[in-house]
């Protein structure tokens, strides 16, 4: 194992509780942790039809899974008390921006109250460590050409962003109320950019939308073609979460540090939706897919978004590993293998190993 990857050895034989295991990022993280020899405990809703990863990667056979809504505090707390994990990775969320417009109540309950439930159970059961995942959308977006850093103002003028900003405010409240006096950090929050990668089939996400249109030979509709986002492969922020978890478990971070980290791509990966679409279609060798631009927006979305990742580079020695072309190639190669009915457990293991060799 390369020296820069040795932090991953920290997870061997550790009991790791992951929320959101049936989701896109949660499934990738659970699979990776299982590869590392961790004893993974999952809490999540049952997989939706669009959530293909959990079953494709055979996670039901690999991890101890509880099907539960994180809004059910009593049941959630009983599981965390019973399992007493070494570390919790909290990823469960309502993660679709458009869905937050149509169903704000569920979005707010899950992203705010569900997160409070995790923090409270972590506190009263004296769990050792917590990596608490929110989103880059937690920052008050001014639609300016600036990269948001961890000390920038939180906020949101739409339901999704405000739910994520609120989750961060709740985290800050718990940290300062109960954990600020500890010598070493036990919990940290993370804010990642727009993740892409194999296995995501959610609606209103650019890569799944392209894949579905390509396979069905239907026109592709772009909702916000000029919106710029910090695109990164799903393994990039997950490597940051795992590195951060390693530092927490090994008491390498003191509480005088701000307990929040951005994980995003280098600035050259921040491109607009139209640019990403062209790269994906080129990789798919598709030049006859008609693209429609959806006129008139039902809900607000920021035009510009990028993250400042200097803190993660300096304090954690974390770096993005893939450029934009590699990110697209990793993503499309996974989908091609999936639709070609290849052994996706082996393929996904190989892709993680390839990522670690970069």
Feature-to-residue mapping (PLM):
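Residue-level signal for the nucleotide or nucleotide-sugar donor/cofactor binding architecture
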Residues: 6, 71, 102, 110, ...
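NAD(P)-dependent short-chain dehydrogenase/reductase
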Residues: 142-147, 151, 160, 168-254, ...
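C-terminal "lid/loop" region of Rossmann-like NAD(P)-dependent oxidoreductases
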Residues: 255-262, 271-277, 282-304, 345-351
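N-terminal Rossmann-like NAD(P)+-binding domain of SDR-like oxidoreductases, especially those catalyzing
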Residues: 1-192, 196, 338, 349-357
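Short arginine-rich
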Residues: 333-343
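Conserved C-terminal active-site "lid" loop/helix of NAD(P)H-dependent oxidoreductases
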Residues: 234, 259-260, 297-319, 330, ...
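Non-catalytic, hydrophobic alpha-helical segments
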Residues: 237, 241, 263, 276, ...
